[in-house]
Amino acid sequence: MGPGTGVDAQTAIEAHLRHGFPGQRVVVQGWRTDALAMPHVRVLRVDPETRGGLWLHVSSGASVPAPGGPPAAESEGSEFVLVTPFKTLRAVELLAMVVYFHGVEELKVGDTVSVGEPWLPGSSCGHLLVSSPYLLADELWMLPLPGRAVHFRWVIPITARERAYALDRGLEALEQRFEEVGLESWDPHRSSVV
């Protein structure tokens, strides 16, 4: 495979995360669900530094065309980041869903994906909002590859009310509410901010 595609991109993304999270364990996870098989995409899990810390899950391969598929029309691509409060394969399922929809129609900052059920058991959040990766250090937001730039997008679980608020007042207004309340998006039992 050529530079910036397939395995080369996955290797670069993994190295990018290992550099950004030195000393933390990065685990490669593939996926195969009943409804979705994408062997060119996997999830990288960054384990927390300390017990009780947050788990970071990052897609790897969504930013490049599928093998045998049409070539990329753009010189930029996106990978998606989901934060969970504990180790769970549900994060892999959710990222598979996001990557699938991204493959159908490119997801941009401000777009939402309906999960159709709580993102984690007991949560009132059943939608995922694509946002800028505010939790990551600035140098981790983008990875330059030969002929392609990979942008990392945060996937934030939100409620139906928060989704409606963003549609009505805009993403910036919703993100302002997140900031005002000190949103802990990874908390499955959090209340709606609106």
Range-by-range predicted roles:
Residues 1-194:
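Acidic, proline/glycine-rich low-complexity IDRs
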